[in-house]
């Protein structure tokens, strides 16, 4: 106890001494904060990547990217997550076919080309990170988007219907998609000039609904391909 009191007396003496040297104390504190801040802020500028891409993961095609834009615009992220957490019950639910082997949860490398990522935080509807492995056809997805209450076995579903996405009045804006691809290339997504040149033919006469279906069928597909190659 005596030793502790002695320490407090010493500390109090030091504090009193610095109280009389406010300018110097402020200067030293500022220097310490700046040095600490530099150690925190400078290293990230030299990091080209923080996650190693999964070898089978490829950038979205023009049609899939258009569908992703529609997904964001319609607010799907407000009700669906895109990240399977590393819990057994969650993996069992969202990887029923065991397409991802023993580790069926989401990996960082699956999202390297997502700008922004669409993990979400609310599951009013199911997680969609591995939707491609639910083995649902394009026709199933189309009918589900047109009327969620007649497809999927949930007659009281609160999911909105999106029939207009498949109408001719909602054709894909080709120029906008190509512009988006070029912007993504500028931040590191490996699109090529060939991708830009082929986009108009891939998107010709396609509706936003068709694009959204293509996007849903892409989710989790590439990372599942890696597991197939390991079998």
Region locations from a protein language model:
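Electron-transfer interface patches adjacent to heme c in soluble/periplasmic c-type cytochromes
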Residues: 29-30, 34, 92-208
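Bilobed periplasmic-binding protein/Venus flytrap-like ligand-binding cleft at the lobe interface
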Residues: 71, 143-148, 212-219
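N-terminal targeting pre-sequences for secretion and organelle import
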Residues: 202, 207-213, 228-231
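Post-cleavage N-terminal segment of exported redox proteins
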Residues: 1-60, 110, 184-191, 215-231
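Electrostatic cytochrome c docking/interface patches
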Residues: 48-72, 84-94, 99-102, 124-126, ...
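Surface-exposed patches in mature extracellular/periplasmic domains of secreted proteins
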Residues: 79-81, 153-161, 223-231
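The canonical Cys-X-X-Cys-His
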Residues: 67, 73-82, 212, 216
